[in-house]
């Protein structure tokens, strides 16, 4: 047997080059204008009509099929049990490294899915709000590991997702400020009976330790109905992080309230050296130790090239 065919046979994913994936859009309509797409794009991402048409519309079509199937299964189970539970939200996880473009992908999906017919209520929550406050991280010696699994208030995040799946409302999530690099005290967003909830974060596919006493320990992805992993090679991610750091030095870091205001006056060479040091110390370590090992747990992997566009798509076999 051909070794490549054998490898493909046992590969848990079907891998599509960009051109093949784009054909799966079929007649899924484009519901976003160019100016709306531009507003969804993060500062260093490349997102345009072509990227939405060729990558995200096929994904939107796929998700519409998955959501409809889940709704039919829910109705069948309800009839079987003879109960009248409220329909639970369909939860989509979006994972991947710092600087890979998770926020852009999550916002694009929210915008596209919210324009399905009939118009579903689609909410987006990032796990940044579930980071422990800086004061707690400082006390525990975890500031250099912010974004690592141990830096999150996992019980609060699991409680939030459990309440969402249980149909409770409203459910509150803390607010995080990228300006102050900290949780905003006494500030919350409320999520109330969404049809679809998108949860975006670097470690949302993280697994927990195996139980020693036989009792199951829930993890965030236990609550997901579908998950997307944004992927790129590590040197590419580092370059994107450095580019973003330079852009922030000239914008957000200039604000005196910014946690990173001390970097605002760095020269280009100093800023690049600082960004690379942060990447190597924190973000690369988190990627290699915690984030990348969760990639095989995703239902769908979007692999990006150095130009920020998706080159191929891997869909987990059923």
Swiss-Prot record:
Catalytic reactions of this protein: (R)-pantothenate + ATP = (R)-4'-phosphopantothenate + ADP + H(+)
Keywords: ATP-binding, Coenzyme A biosynthesis, Cytoplasm, Kinase, Nucleotide-binding, Transferase
InterPro entries on file: P-loop_NTPase (IPR027417), PanK (IPR004566), PRK/URK (IPR006083)
CDD domains reported for this sequence: PanK
Key word Transmembrane present: no
GO annotation terms (biological process): coenzyme A biosynthetic process
EC number of the protein: 2.7.1.33
Pfam families xrefs: PRK
Keyword field contains Ribosomal protein: no
Main localization (coarse): cytoplasm
Molecular function GO labels: ATP binding; pantothenate kinase activity
Associated pathway: Cofactor biosynthesis; coenzyme A biosynthesis; CoA from (R)-pantothenate: step 1/5
Cellular-component GO terms for this entry: cytoplasm
Residues annotated to bind ATP: 96-103
Enzyme class, broadest EC rank: transferase
SUPFAM superfamilies: P-loop containing nucleoside triphosphate hydrolases
Compartment list: Cytoplasm
Alphabetized HAMAP family for the sequence: Pantothen_kinase_1
Family under the similarity heading: Belongs to the prokaryotic pantothenate kinase family.
Protein name stated in the entry: Pantothenate kinase
Organism: Nitrobacter winogradskyi (strain ATCC 25391 / DSM 10237 / CIP 104748 / NCIMB 11846 / Nb-255)
Gene: coaA
């Amino acid at each position: 047997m051909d070794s490549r065919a054998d490898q493909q046979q046992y590969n848990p994913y079907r891998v599509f080059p960009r051109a093949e994936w784009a054909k799966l859009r079929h007649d899924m309509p484009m519901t976003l204008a160019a100016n709306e797409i531009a507003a969804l794009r993060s500062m260093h991402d490349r997102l345009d009509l072509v990227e939405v048409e060729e990558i995200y519309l096929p994904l939107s079509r796929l998700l519409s099929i998955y959501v409809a199937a889940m709704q039919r299964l829910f109705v069948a189970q309800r009839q079987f049990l003879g109960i009248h539970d409220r329909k639970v939200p369909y939860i989509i996880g979006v994972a991947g490294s710092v600087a890979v473009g998770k926020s852009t992908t999550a916002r694009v999906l929210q915008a596209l899915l919210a324009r399905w017919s009939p118009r579903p209520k689609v909410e987006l929550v990032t796990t940044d709000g579930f980071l422990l406050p800086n004061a707690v991280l400082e006390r525990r010696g975890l500031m250099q590991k912010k974004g690592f699994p141990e830096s999150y208030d996992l019980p609060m995040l699991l409680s939030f997702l459990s309440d969402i799946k249980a149909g409770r409302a409203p459910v509150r999530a803390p607010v995080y400020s990228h300006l102050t690099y900290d949780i905003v005290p006494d500030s919350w967003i409320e999520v109330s009976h969404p049809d679809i909830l998108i949860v975006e974060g670097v470690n949302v596919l993280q697994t927990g330790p195996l139980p020693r006493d036989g009792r199951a320990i829930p993890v965030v992805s236990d609550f997901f109905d579908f998950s997307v992993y944004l992927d790129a090679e590590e040197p590419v991610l580092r370059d994107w992080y450095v580019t973003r750091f330079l852009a922030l030095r000239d914008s957000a870091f200039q604000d005196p309230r910014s946690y990173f205001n001390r970097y605002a006056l760095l020269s280009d060479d100093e800023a690049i050296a600082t960004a690379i040091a942060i990447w190597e110390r924190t973000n690369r370590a988190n990627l290699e130790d915690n984030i990348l090992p969760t990639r095989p747990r995703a239902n769908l992997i979007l692999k990006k090239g150095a130009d920020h566009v998706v080159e191929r798509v891997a869909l987990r076999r059923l």
